[in-house]
Amino acid sequence: MALNLQDKQAIVAEVSEVAKGALSAVVADSRGVTVDKMTELRKACREAGVTVRVVRNTLLRRAVEGTSYEVLKDAFVGPTLIAFSSEHPGAAARLFKDFAKANPAFEIKAAAFEGEFIPGSNIDRLATLPTYEEAIARLMSTMKEAAAGKLVRTLAALRDQKEAA
């Protein structure tokens, strides 16, 4: 489908706007995946606050210029599906990783987080980031354990002091 100049400019502006507000981006190749499966992926992405687009590589290169996702330019080869996470940095990576397990034809090319290029083989780094709630829960459990440990050490010191006296 041929796009006129205004359509191309609109696509570049839209993708650029989404990229500027995103926390991370993941690039994949969806050749060989059925339309039904892709529809399921898009639905899951919408529910997780992830924007998914299939955009021509030249337009995508222009859209990410001047953003932290410029490092992904080399990954824009062949059919490109790009996902921007706007609510949680690991959301798109987690969804794509799970989808790739179930659909071997789906290939994750690369990802970017805070201007750092992450190859598709290392997608676990981004996919395993804890959500905000998980991070708070981990912090609270660590703080509780530290307080309990301090109490135990204090009681043990008191016991030792009384035994010595």
From Swiss-Prot:
Keyword match rRNA-binding: yes
Q: Which InterPro entries match?
A: Ribosomal_uL10 (IPR001790), Ribosomal_uL10-like_sf (IPR043141), Ribosomal_uL10_bac (IPR022973), Ribosomal_uL10_bac_type (IPR047865), Ribosomal_uL10_CS_bac (IPR002363)
PROSITE patterns given in the database record? RIBOSOMAL_L10 (PS01109)
Q: Molecular function terms in GO for this entry?
A: large ribosomal subunit rRNA binding; structural constituent of ribosome
UniProt key word Zinc:
no
Q: Which GO terms describe its biological process?
A: translation
Q: Supply the alphabetized keyword list.
A: Ribonucleoprotein, Ribosomal protein, RNA-binding, rRNA-binding
Q: Which domain of life is it from?
A: Bacteria
Q: Name one GO cellular component term.
A: large ribosomal subunit
Identify the stretch annotated as signal peptide in this record.
none
Described by its record, this protein's role is as follows: Forms part of the ribosomal stalk, playing a central role in the interaction of the ribosome with GTP-bound translation factors.
Stated family: Belongs to the universal ribosomal protein uL10 family.
**How does this protein assemble?**
Part of the ribosomal stalk of the 50S ribosomal subunit. The N-terminus interacts with L11 and the large rRNA to form the base of the stalk. The C-terminus forms an elongated spine to which L12 dimers bind in a sequential fashion forming a multimeric L10(L12)X complex.
Record protein name field? Large ribosomal subunit protein uL10
Question: What organism does the record attribute this protein to?
Answer: Proteus mirabilis (strain HI4320)
Q: Which gene encodes it?
A: rplJ
